[in-house]
UniProtKB/Swiss-Prot annotation:
PANTHER family: 3-ISOPROPYLMALATE DEHYDRATASE SMALL SUBUNIT (PTHR43345:SF5), 3-ISOPROPYLMALATE DEHYDRATASE SMALL SUBUNIT 2-RELATED-RELATED (PTHR43345)
Signal sequence bounds: none
Keyword entries, A-Z: Amino-acid biosynthesis, Branched-chain amino acid biosynthesis, Leucine biosynthesis, Lyase
Domain of life per record: Bacteria
Gene: leuD
Family from the record: Belongs to the LeuD family. LeuD type 1 subfamily.
Function summary: Catalyzes the isomerization between 2-isopropylmalate and 3-isopropylmalate, via the formation of 2-isopropylmaleate.
A Pfam family this chain is assigned to: Aconitase_C
Name of the molecule in the record: 3-isopropylmalate dehydratase small subunit
InterPro entries referenced in this protein's UniProt entry, alphabetically: 3-IsopropMal_deHydase_ssu, Aconitase/3IPM_dehydase_swvl, AconitaseA/IPMdHydase_ssu_swvl, IPMI_Swivel, LeuD
SUPFAM superfamilies: LeuD/IlvD-like
One GO process term, biological-process aspect: L-leucine biosynthetic process
């Protein structure tokens, strides 16, 4: 899969301040009937996003006109908990999110984000509340900062994940960096 590198990214924000949003809330299991990574966006947050008649829920923040086109989700603690389905990351990416800022993430969900070219960022509640006041924010991955016009916040990220996202590398691309060594090994053994 081709991954678009993330270095400095400016995007529109949408707040969704709930804690413990699990993978079944992100993408209900009824929609897991395909293995392709695309096509899950319309089902992201399905039970919150739509009313029983199938129309958009006007009270769901991402449905509000002011948030249309948002690519940075600002949310609560323990985002992506629950089952380890990678479909949750696929749904959020297909919906249009490139960055998710939360208080914390499930470990498996965090990894699934990075494998699908989404940057998960952990910030405290005060920092997230500040960011949510702005329509757009800028994320500088090389310097590990999230900025508004008035303030910047530092975030931590493992160097391996950071390097993969900055250079647009997936697991296959990383493996192919060692192609000569692999071929040499195969010829030797």
């Amino acid at each position: 899969m081709e991954i678009k590198p993330i270095t400095i990214y400016t995007g529109k924000t949408v707040p969704l301040f709930y804690d413990n949003i699990d993978t079944d809330q992100i993408i209900p299991k009824v929609h897991l009937k395909r293995v392709s990574k695309s096509g899950f966006g319309p089902f992201a947050f399905d039970e919150w996003r739509y009313l029983p008649d199938g129309s958009d829920n006007p009270d769901f923040n991402p449905n509000k006109p002011k948030y249309h086109g948002a690519s940075i989700l600002i949310t609560g603690d323990n985002f992506g908990c629950g089952s380890s389905r990678e479909h949750a990351a696929w749904a959020l990416k297909d919906y249009g999110f490139n960055i998710i800022i939360a208080g914390s993430f499930s470990d498996i969900f965090y990894m699934n984000c990075t494998k699908n070219a989404m940057l998960p960022i952990c910030l405290n509640q005060k920092e997230r509340e500040h960011l949510a006041q702005f329509d757009e924010i800028t994320v500088d991955l090389p310097n590990q900062t999230v900025s508004t016009v008035s303030q910047s916040f530092h975030f931590d990220i493992d160097e391996t994940w950071k390097n993969k996202l900055i250079h647009g590398l997936d697991d296959i691309a990383i493996t192919l960096q060692f192609e000569n060594l692999i071929e040499k090994y195969e010829k030797t053994f």
